[in-house]
Amino acid sequence: MENTFILNRTRTEPKNGGKLLEVRNLKTHFPIKAGLMQKVVGYVRAVDGISFSIDYGKTLGLVGESGCGKTTVGKTILRLTPKTDGDVIFDGVDIYALDHKDLRAMRPKMQLIFQDPYSSLSPRLPVSEIIGEAVKEHGLVENRHMDDYLDHVMKNCASSTST
C-alpha cells in the first residue's frame, strides 16, 4: 500500500499542460559601467537564452561551474533579479506579470535550494531533519504526520537516484 500525503494547501489541476515551471529564452544581462558618470559601456550576459521546463512532481538540479549563472537563473525565476528578456511561467502564471501583492502571495510556493557540499548540509543534522525544517516552516504537513511524510520523501529520493 502506497502512502499518500495531503499537504496543507489547496491543489488544483495543472494549468500549464502538466508543467509546474516553464522558462523560455530567459536572459539576464548586467550593465558594465565606467567613468565618473557611470556610463554603460557594455553588458555581462550572466544568463543568455536558457529554456527548460519542470513537470509537476519532478525535480530539477541545475549544475555547472562556479560563475556560470546558476544562482542568477534561480534569482531571475523568482524575480529577485530582473530579467532582460524571456518568459517565466509558474503553475500557469506569468511571474513577471504579477504585481507586488500577488508575487508575495506566490513566493511560499517557490524556492531555491542552494547546495554547497562543504557548507550547506550540517553534519550534525540528518538530511530528513533539514527537509523537515522547511516543511514545518511552511506548514505543509501536520506535525503528527511529519515522521511518516519524511520517511516517504526520503524513500522516493533514494529510489529516484538509483534509476
PLM features: what roles do these ranges have?
Residues 1-163:
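ABC transporter nucleotide-binding domains
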